[in-house]
């Protein structure tokens, strides 16, 4: 719901130097961004309020090139989306995904704090069927083609009882053990057949988010520049708040790809923060002046 129209209170300090007018205008009232579903920028704290009037706010501190000092969200309308933390992508029997493994412990800590604050956990994973193979676009199949990178081909039979590559309900498509150990019945599980889990309004995750009224999405998982970024990009385009937990993500593409994704998200699509900032976030009471 949009907040009431705000009159910006400003203080002005101008001076003339050699016929060149210079000075500053300082806003002291909240600055709205957006239409009916507004963010508020609070000049007094240099924080963005994404809570849309909620009485409970989770306040995260961060420093992004002096542009802001953090943001606050409503836990009740937030979802932690863990992308592709599956055996096929992270388990060492398939590849040495150092960045993915490094993201495991921070993500587990974020999951624990999310549960404490009532933030919904959603697992977004590749999970295809024979029908998907028959109707899949050529470019998607090529991305998993044998001989190109480390891919073996979507639907290919993997050794032993590992099942067909990224098919639903197979061991290789299952959650990596550290995550499987903490998944709970109240968690939500969504399959995807593209890099993005939000590419279509008919995607299960998309339908859930719209029906539930969830507004703020926190992202963890692999690979940062591929399936994570693909989903973030679509979430941004459809109007959800996007927060990337950078140490809870990882990619095999290289550090440059990670940094570029972080830059794109923080500059254009939302916010970038860390597991530490999230786990140390403060929960405000209604009377606190944020």
Please state what every model-predicted region is.
Residues 86, 127-129, 223, 249:
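Catalytic metal-binding/acid-base residues of hydrolase active sites
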Residues 2-79, 109-112, 116-117, 142-290:
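Active-site-adjacent betaalpha module
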Residues 126-151:
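A basic- and aromatic-enriched beta-loop-alpha substructure that forms the phosphate/nucleotide-
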Residues 92-94, 132-137, 176, 201-202:
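Short, conserved acidic/polar surface loops in the N-terminal third of protein domains
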Residues 76, 93-126:
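A short alpha/beta connector and helix-capping loop motif
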Residues 86-92:
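Short acidic, Gly/Ser-rich segments with clustered Asp/Glu that frequently serve as metal-coordination loops
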Residues 82, 119-132, 245:
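Short beta-strand segments at enzyme active-site cores
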Residues 79-86:
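Asp-based phosphoryl-transfer active-site loop
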């Amino acid at each position: 719901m949009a907040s009431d129209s705000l009159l910006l209170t400003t203080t002005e300090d101008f001076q003339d130097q050699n016929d060149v007018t210079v000075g500053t205008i300082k806003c002291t009232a909240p600055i709205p961004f957006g239409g009916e579903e507004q963010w508020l920028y609070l000049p007094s704290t240099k924080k963005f309020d994404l809570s849309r009037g909620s009485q409970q706010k989770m306040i995260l501190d961060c420093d992004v090139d002096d542009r802001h000092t953090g943001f606050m969200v409503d836990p009740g309308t937030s979802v932690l989306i863990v992308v592709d933390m599956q055996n096929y992508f992270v388990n060492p029997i398939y590849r040495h995904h150092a960045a993915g493994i490094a993201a495991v412990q921070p993500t587990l800590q974020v999951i624990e704090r999310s549960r404490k604050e009532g933030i919904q956990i959603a697992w977004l994973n590749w999970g295809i069927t024979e029908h998907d193979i028959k109707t899949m676009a050529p470019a998607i199949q090529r991305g998993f083609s044998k001989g190109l990178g480390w891919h073996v081909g979507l639907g290919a039979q993997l050794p032993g009882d590992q099942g067909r590559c990224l098919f639903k309900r197979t061991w290789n498509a299952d959650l990596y053990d550290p995550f499987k150990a903490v998944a709970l019945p109240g968690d939500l599980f969504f399959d995807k057949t593209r890099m993005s889990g939000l590419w279509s309004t008919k995607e299960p995750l998309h339908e859930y988010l719209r029906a539930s009224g969830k507004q703020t999405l926190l992202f963890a998982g692999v690979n940062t520049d591929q399936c994570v970024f693909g989903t973030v990009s679509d979430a941004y385009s459809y109007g959800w708040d996007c927060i990337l937990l950078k140490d809870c993500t990882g990619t095999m593409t290289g550090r440059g790809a990670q940094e570029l994704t972080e830059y794109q998200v923080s500059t254009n699509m939302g916010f970038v923060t860390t597991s530490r900032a999230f786990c140390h976030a403060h929960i405000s009471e209604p009377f606190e002046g944020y």
